[in-house]
UniProtKB/Swiss-Prot annotation:
Main localization of the protein described in the UniProt heading: mitochondrion
Mode of membrane association: Single-pass type II membrane protein
Gene: tom22
Pfam family membership, one: Tom22
Family to which the UniProt record says this protein belongs: Belongs to the Tom22 family.
Assembly and interaction partners: Forms part of the preprotein translocase complex of the outer mitochondrial membrane (TOM complex) which consists of at least 8 different proteins (tom5, tom6, tom7, tom20, tom22, tom37, tom40 and tom70).
Protein name in UniProt: Mitochondrial import receptor subunit tom22
Cytoplasmic topological segments: 1-91
Protein localization: Mitochondrion outer membrane
Length: 144
């Protein structure tokens, strides 16, 4: 029996490989062109899109369990800050009214004490002036 064997020319193999490579490069180049076209179409509506639309689109990205956790955390933080603000307001009310009820009478008594001290000093100065004018004489207006 006779065996047939095909002898392949090396130049033919190289030419075929080169055409395959050229076809692949052409296909890749075509895909790049199509991809760049789709990239441009991705940016077409961005100028009309608002920040609210973008935030609403995040709803689709974030899973439900995470959204629930985030909402619960925000609610807890809001409640805590609200209670802290209420406590701060009530504390300021107590401190300010206490300062007024206790501080004003105290300041008035200090002022009265200062006036009394000033009056006593004036009396001593008058006595000293009388002693210089008439040594040993007593004044009828001021008791000794």
């Amino acid at each position: 029996m006779v065996k047939l064997e095909e002898v392949v020319d090396e130049t033919e193999v190289q030419n075929e490989q080169q055409t395959v490579i050229e076809k692949d490069q052409y296909i890749y180049a075509q895909e790049d062109v199509e991809e760049s076209d789709s990239d441009e179409s991705d940016f077409e509506g961005l100028e009309e899109e608002t920040i609210i639309d973008r935030i609403a689109a995040l709803k689709e990205i974030v899973p439900v369990t995470w959204r629930v956790k985030i909402a619960d955390g925000a609610k807890t933080a809001t409640t805590g800050l609200s209670k802290l603000a209420q406590f701060g307001g009530k504390s300021m009310w107590v401190i300010s009214t206490s300062a007024l009820l206790l501080g004003v009478p105290f300041m008035m008594s200090l002022e009265e004490e200062a006036q009394l001290t000033e009056y006593e000093k004036q009396i001593k100065d008058q006595r000293g002036a009388n002693e210089v004018i008439a040594p040993g004489a007593t004044s009828g207006a001021l008791p000794q």
